[in-house]
């Protein structure tokens, strides 16, 4: 198998819904965010990423590096109009960051909210074609739809429904 060159840095991408520059102290915000500050001190900070008002299209842009309309995610993944720009999934013709990193030997892991598979395909029985493991990630831990119960979340590890951890 292909392995990254010795000394190749880790790649950590963080996407937070409903968050702006004013929310993070590393960008001058008033909220103290020491862990994000440490990540920002040791890596790159981007200041010009186009986000949409919706989570699925923003995720599609970030993972593909392309406009959300061009990859089939005009709105949240709950909707499939049949038109190419709004299929509720990232088009197969659009490679993801995880697929490209995997091709270069990187191990990839997605954590948290996915919301990039049509709602009818985001259950324990699949189909799994648009789930993280089928879009280039080696591992996944999180919830598939746009929201989950905060006290009794519907959590998945890889492609398998799991019981939430006890708190």
Where are these regions (language model features)?
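Formylglycine-dependent sulfatase
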Residues: 1-167
